[in-house]
Amino acid sequence: MPYMAMHGLTVALLLIFLAGGTEAFRICAFNAQRLTLSKLAKEPVMDTLVQILARCDIMVLQEVVDSSQKTVSLLLRELNRFDSSRTYSFLNSSLLGRSTYKEKYVYIYRSDKTQILNSYQYNDTNDLFAREPFVAQFALPSKILPSVVLVPLHTTPKDVEKELNALYDVFLDVSQRWQNEDVILLGDFNADCASLTKKRLNSLLLRTEAGFHWVISDGEDTTVRASTNCTYDRIVMHGQGCQTLLRAAAPFNFPRSFQLTEEEALSISDHYPVEVELSQATHNIQLFSLAILLLLSLLPSQLS
């Protein structure tokens, strides 16, 4: 094959392979605002939720209000129909809460890309949490970060400071239990505006102890209403693997992306999802090695 043709083919292959290596692993949290079977019966709500979920490799839903599995099962069925090239599964907590109002934490994840290694309900012996975290450890497609622990929390506005300080104890518990320092704390923390002043926020253990990175910045609006501007929803990362692979983190403004009015968006939720993207380091290393081999294959052509 002539050199120029070989060169063109090699470059084309490199571009294809390297483009494939740019895909990120996305972890999300979303307060879906009293998600029930009757809410999912509204077609625009279902359609939008499915599109939001399809963005994420792991999604942690909060405010799932369902004593049965019907709501999540229906949502999962529609999600798997939406993109048949992917396979989604779920894991949920029991109903949690101190009053008659109770809700679940629900993990919806791409089982073709990740698997749950362990999970447990945090033992809140002192009743510090209204909805104690339901913790899960996931396998990731990365040699740098082979697994990560997710700790979701939906605080109550009147106890934000107490619950967020108690979340530090959950971190200690899970990191010792599974010998894993790569932990992501995420959810609707109510960590802003009237629920938590700047001074109280900066005095939290998760702010003063070393190693915790609040990747959803203060000042980011995670609310749908134009009349509010609060960073209620957060993602806090700990661990060298997480920091090494961190690519981006932000709220997902779904009304803007899907061209919804505020009223239409509020039928879904009054919160934006928050997302963090991790580089898929294993894939990138393999592709880099392949790229080197392809480039070396050009040398004989150049020398002849």
Swiss-Prot record:
Keywords: Disulfide bond, Endonuclease, Endoplasmic reticulum, Glycoprotein, Hydrolase, Nuclease, Signal. Pfam families: Exo_endo_phos (PF03372). GO terms for biological process: DNA catabolic process. The keyword Phosphoprotein does not apply. The active site is at residues 103, 154. The lineage of its organism: Eukaryota, Metazoa, Chordata, Craniata, Vertebrata. It is found in: Endoplasmic reticulum. It comes from Cricetulus griseus. Its EC number is 3.1.21.-. One of its GO terms (cellular component) is nucleus. Glycans are attached at residues 92, 123, 229. Its main location: endoplasmic reticulum. Belongs to the DNase I family. It is an enzyme of class 3 (hydrolase). Gene3D superfamilies: Endonuclease/exonuclease/phosphatase (3.60.10.10). GO terms for molecular function: deoxyribonuclease I activity; DNA binding. SUPFAM superfamilies: DNase I-like (SSF56219). Residues 1-24 form the signal peptide. This is Deoxyribonuclease-1-like 1. Disulfide bonds join 193-230.
